[in-house]
Amino acid sequence: MILFGSTGSIGVNALKLAALKNIPISALACGDNIALLNEQIARFKPKFVAIKDSKNKHLVKHDRVFIGQEGLEQILTECQDKLLFNAIVGFAGLKSTLKAKELGKNIALANKESLVVAGSFLKGVKFLPVDSEHAALKFLLEGKKNIAKLYITASGGAFYRYKIKDLNQVSVKDALKHPNWNMGAKITIDSATMANKLFEIIEAYHLYDFKEIDALIEPRSLVHAMCEFKNGASTAYFSKADMKLAISDAIFEKQDTPILEAVDFSKMPALKFHPISTKKYPIFKLKNTFLKEPNLGVIINAANEVGVYNFLENKSGFLDIAKCIFKALDHFGVPKISSIEEVFEYDFKTREYLRS
């Protein structure tokens, strides 16, 4: 397995599971956490290593250290492994997904932005979704026909129990307190704004070629997806909130190893499902438009990344993230994209516009 994003939350869990099944790790790549990378190198002994910046190369305890995006693509070309586990955060992960597609590799995809911004250019790839909702949908949909509607669930994020009027005063520290999941900073903020759920709906559309998809808030994160059939029956996927289950589903050939303690239905508290309030989560207003116009993905994602970065750096408020997205959409409208090059152009133009 080739693992990009090895020092993040997903990457660390992927390595724990790889060790459980003695899956060889041929390559590791990370950003700036060189201390943890060196621990991983000592443990897993990869043939190739990549880091973001050449200034840290002398700190890496390995003979073959590649640098930046060019280095990632060199590793993909030289390494014979058929599986790329892409856990790079954000738009930065797209080029690696595209290169893996070109080389015919399977992709365990934690980088949902690849599909959000360029799903139409990634047809034919064998994706193994590293997301609790999409792993749940995969299980529920296997061999099934006559599907009427799909649902994925959201916890509501850090501010689910906050009043709308209090959201203009929340801090970064407040936003990073997710009630159920232990995740990286970017996705935790995306959960609080509901951008993450918007992206997951588009990801599900690209993975399963189905547009009748919605999301509901289930505050305990015990139900991850539901499938409604044309005859009125429905099925649901239950598990405790832990990404290791979705990761194991992507990288293990057989699902015969205990990963989590099962949900004890006799002790399970009452479950409630709630519609997502677009007053509280204005980004979610875009769901139907986005499903009709998937090309909007590059604008929405770039604007979201700018907004989240500004919030995390205390340059703007929490509510400004959504404002950033709507400002970009008002300016650019629906882009006409006919090539992957245009995806990169619109990403660049959106960021430039919002920074000007």
UniProtKB/Swiss-Prot annotation:
State a single Pfam family of this protein: DXP_redisom_C
Q: What is the uppermost EC class here?
A: oxidoreductase
Q: Where does NADPH bind?
A: T7, G8, S9, I10, G31, N33, N111, E113, G184
Q: Which UniProt keywords apply?
A: Isoprene biosynthesis, Manganese, Metal-binding, NADP, Oxidoreductase
Q: Pathway it acts in?
A: Isoprenoid biosynthesis; isopentenyl diphosphate biosynthesis via DXP pathway; isopentenyl diphosphate from 1-deoxy-D-xylulose 5-phosphate: step 1/6
The catalysed reaction is: 2-C-methyl-D-erythritol 4-phosphate + NADP(+) = 1-deoxy-D-xylulose 5-phosphate + NADPH + H(+)
Q: Give me the residues that bind Mn(2+), please.
A: D131, E133, E200
Homology family: Belongs to the DXR family.
What is the protein name for this chain?
1-deoxy-D-xylulose 5-phosphate reductoisomerase
Lineage of the species this protein comes from: Bacteria, Pseudomonadati, Campylobacterota, Epsilonproteobacteria, Campylobacterales
